Amino acid sequence: MKLLAATVLLLTICSLEGALVRRQAKEPCVESPVSQYFQTVTDYGKDLMEKVKSPELQAEAKSYFEKSKEQLTPLIKKAGTELVNFLNYFLEL
């Protein structure tokens, strides 16, 4: 009977010590994934800024904007003319 009581007491003490050790251990930081995400975004931003500085990309962007301006200018003028005609129609009523 004493052996059984000693065994139960020993098991109880061991499990309590194990729980205490688990509580004292550092928990994994919750901020770690968030900080990793922001670090990744920062790295991508730096890489993007390096790529934007290249003259080839700047020339390509400039030609793209000039081409879109050439294509959109007639459409905008036509839309403006049609808007004026539309408003004149209502003013003549």
Curated annotation (Swiss-Prot):
Region forming the signal peptide: 1-18
Subcellular location: Secreted
Molecular-function annotations in GO: cholesterol transfer activity; high-density lipoprotein particle binding; lipid binding
Cellular component aspect of the GO annotation: spherical high-density lipoprotein particle
Residues with the Methionine sulfoxide modification: 49
InterPro entries cross-referenced by the UniProt entry: ApoA-II, ApoA-II_sf
Major location category of this protein: secreted
Modified residues (Phosphoserine): 54, 68
GO terms for biological process, alphabetical: cholesterol homeostasis; cholesterol transport; lipoprotein metabolic process; positive regulation of phagocytosis; protein stabilization
Keyword set, alphabetical order: Cleavage on pair of basic residues, Disulfide bond, HDL, Lipid transport, Oxidation, Phosphoprotein, Secreted, Signal, Transport
Superkingdom as given in the UniProt entry: Eukaryota
Similarity remark: Belongs to the apolipoprotein A2 family.
Job description of the protein: May stabilize HDL (high density lipoprotein) structure by its association with lipids, and affect the HDL metabolism.
Subunit structure: Homodimer; disulfide-linked. Interacts with NAXE and NDRG1.
Protein name per UniProt: Apolipoprotein A-II
Species of provenance: Pongo abelii
Gene expressing this chain: APOA2
